[in-house]
């Protein structure tokens, strides 16, 4: 890889790989008014129409650049606060009320984003110029099956999203950073680990220890890039066995990330109700304590920590994921370059 390509790959990874679905908000965060967000370095306005259908377009009025998120929700379109220009969910200007027969009307001026809502989260497709149409959003069993109950926890951290991915791909830190937690106080402080291929990615696991601590983690690519792990739970923590977590690290910009963690257990009927009650009234606070430990460490890493590392065997899974991401970034850039390069003409 040349230095020029390396820089471009680094820049792409800093704000996130394209051509994936990313969770951008919990559902409860979007109310009647348009909402402006920044994700993957792109400014987006989201809103719901009268039927609850979601829309997402660039947060920029094509007239003079005002934020559409400061304007009004008109159902299937938003109106700019500055001059009242109306734009629909496809990014097309439908009305310029201040003048007659404005040539701006009817033009698709803004990028629109495919958007889906599931399991209490809002997902947006971030496609590059070659992939405006989304791939299917295929979620892991814990989110796709009604046999599982899930609750979403999300937080914003002041660090690059790659550090959040590194953190989840590092099971060994559970025995140290989270050693006094309600769920990761047991197990060996030393372990041998291995990488295993899965149908959609990799699993990184401790050898000879399972269902004792944070003993394994999986990363998979199924239209979105998700991570899965399980934490053993004692019977006093309610029915459903081990507690599964489905995690995402969505870039906000180069220096901020929003993490999403769906907490899942396989329960139904009265057991589901019991677990939800226990979680909301007892367990949720304990999990926030664990998450805050990760938060504090990641926000206080040494400057440019990734450029000054000495990795060892426990970092193998993390290193494999880093290389996987680099290869995907190289492939995305190469595909864009191939289209942009003028074709040779024969004389």
Regions found by a protein language model. Give the residues of each.
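Short, positively charged
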Residues: 13-17, 268-270
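Residues at beta-strand starts and edge strands
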Residues: 18, 33, 120, 243, ...
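Short, charged N-terminal helix-start/capping segments
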Residues: 1-13, 255-265
């Amino acid at each position: 890889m040349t230095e020029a390509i390396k820089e471009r790959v680094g820049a792409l990874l800093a704000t996130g790989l394209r051509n994936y679905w990313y969770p951008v908000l919990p559902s409860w965060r979007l109310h009647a008014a348009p909402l402006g967000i920044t994700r993957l370095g792109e400014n987006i306005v989201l809103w719901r129409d009268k039927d609850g259908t979601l829309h997402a377009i660039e947060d920029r009025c094509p007239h003079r650049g005002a934020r559409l998120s400061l304007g009004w929700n008109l159902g299937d379109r938003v109106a700019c606060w500055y001059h009242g220009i109306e734009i629909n969910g496809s990014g097309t200007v439908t009305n310029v009320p201040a003048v007659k027969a404005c040539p701006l009307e009817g033009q698709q001026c803004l990028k629109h984003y495919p958007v889906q809502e599931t399991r209490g989260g809002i997902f947006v497709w971030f496609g590059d110029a070659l992939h405006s149409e989304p791939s299917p959003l295929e979620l892991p069993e814990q989110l796709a099956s009604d046999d599982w109950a899930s609750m979403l926890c999300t937080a914003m951290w002041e660090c690059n999203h790659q550090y959040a991915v590194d953190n989840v791909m590092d099971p060994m830190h559970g025995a140290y950073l989270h050693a006094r937690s309600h769920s990761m106080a047991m197990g060996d402080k030393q372990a041998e680990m291995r990488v295993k291929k899965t149908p959609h990615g990799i699993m990184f696991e401790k050898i000879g220890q399972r269902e004792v601590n944070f003993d394994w983690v999986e990363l998979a690519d199924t239209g979105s890039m998700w991570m899965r792990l399980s934490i053993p739970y004692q019977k006093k923590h309610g029915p459903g066995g081990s507690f599964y977590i489905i995690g995402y690290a969505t870039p906000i910009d180069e220096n901020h990330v929003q993490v999403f963690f769906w907490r899942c257990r396989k329960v139904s009927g009265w057991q589901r109700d019991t677990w939800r009650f226990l979680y909301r009234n007892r367990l949720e606070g304990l999990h926030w304590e664990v998450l805050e430990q990760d938060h504090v460490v990641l926000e206080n890493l040494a400057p440019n920590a990734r450029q000054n590392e000495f990795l060892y065997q426990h970092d193998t899974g993390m290193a494999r994921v880093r290389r996987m991401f680099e290869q995907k970034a190289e492939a995305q850039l190469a595909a864009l370059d191939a289209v942009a390069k003028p074709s040779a003409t024969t004389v």
